[in-house]
Amino acid sequence: LAIKANYELIKNISVERIRDELCKILITNNPCEGLSLLMGTGILGIILPEINSLVGYTPLCNNHNRDVFNHTLNVIKNTSSNDLILRLSALFHDVGKLNTLKQLPNGHCYFPGHAKEGAIICKPILSRLKFDNDTIDRVSKIIYDHLVLDVNYMPTDGEIKRLLRRV
């Protein structure tokens, strides 16, 4: 209750400290609890408004039956806790969906180019949080390629090797 009443005080904290605390949340065994707490208290809207915009965003689409924020939490939950780059990539992987929404005549939605858009959007966010250039580049590359293996066949060894070299 005290956090909700004073959530705007987060603006008085240095961005480096906010970055460090976000990283601590992301590498815990249950980062979704921390991110949900940030969302529920209003802090997420201040420190990561781009992620907060995904809360409640539920276009009709074939891939997800929940809002994009909860889908993002599920992706984060299924990544390794000792890999900050992967956790950051999971956090931002669908941030491009807000700018790429297209609707089909039947009402269903899709997001052409959302991976590329997300890779672009994440860079200034991570820069704002004072992440180093190597982290920003690695996260952006993973987001850009996060749909590469979304195929209806088993990728060849060569395709997997090329993806790993790019990422």
For every predicted segment, state its role:
Residues 1-87, 91, 95-113, 117-133:
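Glycine- and charge-enriched loop/helix tracts that form the active or gating conduit
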Residues 57-66, 70-77, 131-167:
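Histidine/acidic-rich helix-loop-helix segments that form or flank divalent-metal centers
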